[in-house]
Amino acid sequence: LGNNIPEICEAIGSDVAYDKTTFSAYETEAVYEAMDKERKNVLICGIEAHICVLQTAIDLKAAGYQPVIVADCVSSRKELDKELGLKRAEQEGILITSKEAILFELTRKAGGPVFKQISALIK
């Protein structure tokens, strides 16, 4: 439903794009096949929090994954729609966090090169 942002493709070292005509990314065959069935936690960032992000999270939860929506990495055209999408996700038992919280949760400890890189990113 849109193009990839060049800066994101550069940062992750890939410009892989999947055709997506469904609102839920999990209903896209290429995304479904690319999912690592051994990993159960899925971080979700994207646009239209009240539609695409929400439906993807609900589908992932139904499939046995633990979706985690990164609230400051999602948006909607209207702020109210974003707020309602996040509220609905929370009502569905989906975890909501911030980019800073999840980055430090994944880092696990202070000190070292990874901590320094993450700290520099969020300042």
Model features per residue range: what roles?
Residues L1-K123:
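Active-site-adjacent betaalpha module
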